[in-house]
């Protein structure tokens, strides 16, 4: 990877993060409005995921260009965890001191975004020995690489993402159990469920990276981890369609469009898991085409947002999903840079 491209792939997630920050801040501060109290904080804190993806990109790229100093393997992933902690804390603060139901929704969703950020930061941590993956892949033997992670470290990394995912799922269930207290708990619980799907998808990414670094990635991993991500994306997408159709005429049904966007983020994550599976100890002619997946999902998010912006001129219920989908499109494009880095790092050319 040449120096210019390495800079570009690190700049992309940072630029996307700041687009979310500025757009979210503009939405929230422009007018004091209920819909903006939901969309503003959510779009703003989606930028946290972009910063965590920057940490992942920087961790891998610095190894590829041979500038990954020992101290950086702690500082860069640590930065991601700090961002995740601040995001979760901000979400809890928002709904903890909520003046109305709008802030209750945005607070819970922001906390869920923080859980995703923590999962992405764990992916950055698991990538601190990424340089071993090409060597292990080229080696026909299946012996454990002693330079890789210990079995305990591998299990801790996978366990962390599992913990964050379970937290998101339990959180979603608790919110949905409170639907009787108000429709806003349905909205918050549904979106938290979609965020939980993304966290679960990231288990597959962390497990794939950690296992390939240790050279314990087997045929069952090659088959099952990509399936897990695709299932999560399908669950979120279909969940969104069900909400849209089953709640037609209800303002809450527009939440379904956000769920569809979250499903598209899962499909973006699948590009990385599929790439790692396809090129492990074998050649895959279409490996350099896999980065197109997050580009397509980003475009789908933005096109869907455009339709909802138009619909929002006549029905304010579409205000929130239109803005949130723009933020999700930015996250999908961040994932394009990550899968491109992975493709470059694992290429056998």
Show which residues each predicted segment covers.
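Membrane-interfacial, low-structure loops and terminal tails that flank and connect transmembrane helices
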Residues: 133-149, 217
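Short, charged juxtamembrane terminal tails flanking transmembrane helices
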Residues: 1-3, 137, 342-349
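Glycine-centered signal
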Residues: 69, 125, 139-142
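Short juxtamembrane and helix-loop transition motifs at transmembrane-helix boundaries
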Residues: 38, 68-71, 216-222
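Alpha-helical transmembrane segments and immediately adjacent membrane-interfacial amphipathic helices
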Residues: 6-30, 40-63, 73-98, 104-132, ...
């Amino acid at each position: 990877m040449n120096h210019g491209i390495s800079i570009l792939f690190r700049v992309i997630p940072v630029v996307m993060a700041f687009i979310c920050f500025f757009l979210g801040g503009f939405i929230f501060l422009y007018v004091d409005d209920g819909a903006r109290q939901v969309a503003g904080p959510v779009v703003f804190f989606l930028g946290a995921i972009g910063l965590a993806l920057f940490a992942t990109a920087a961790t891998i790229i610095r190894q590829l260009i041979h500038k990954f100093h020992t101290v950086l393997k702690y500082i860069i992933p640590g930065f991601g965890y700090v961002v995740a902690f601040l995001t979760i804390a901000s979400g809890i603060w928002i709904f903890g001191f909520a003046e109305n139901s709008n802030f209750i929704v945005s607070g819970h969703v922001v906390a869920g975004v923080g859980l995703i950020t923590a999962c992405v930061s764990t992916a950055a941590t698991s990538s601190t020995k990424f340089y071993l993956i090409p060597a292990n892949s080229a080696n026909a033997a299946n012996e454990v690489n002693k330079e890789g992670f210990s079995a305990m470290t591998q299990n801790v990394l996978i366990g962390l993402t599992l913990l964050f995912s379970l937290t998101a799922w339990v959180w979603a269930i608790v919110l949905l159990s409170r639907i009787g207290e108000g429709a806003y708990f349905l909205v918050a619980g549904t979106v938290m469920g979609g965020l939980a799907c993304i966290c679960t998808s990231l288990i597959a990414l962390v497990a794939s990276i950690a296992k390939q670094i240790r050279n314990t990635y087997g045929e069952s991993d090659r088959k099952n981890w990509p399936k897990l991500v695709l299932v999560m994306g399908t669950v979120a997408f279909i969940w969104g369609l069900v909400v849209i159709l089953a709640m037609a005429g209800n303002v809450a049904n527009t939440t379904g469009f956000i769920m569809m966007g979250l499903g598209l983020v899962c499909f973006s994550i699948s590009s990385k898991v599929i790439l790692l599976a396809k090129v492990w100890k074998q050649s895959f002619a279409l490996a350099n085409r896999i980065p197109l997946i997050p580009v397509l999902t980003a475009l789908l998010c933005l096109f869907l947002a455009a339709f909802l912006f138009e619909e929002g001129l006549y029905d304010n219920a579409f205000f929130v999903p239109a803005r949130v989908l723009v933020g999700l499109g930015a996250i999908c494009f961040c994932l394009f840079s990550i899968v491109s880095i992975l493709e470059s790092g694992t290429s056998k050319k």
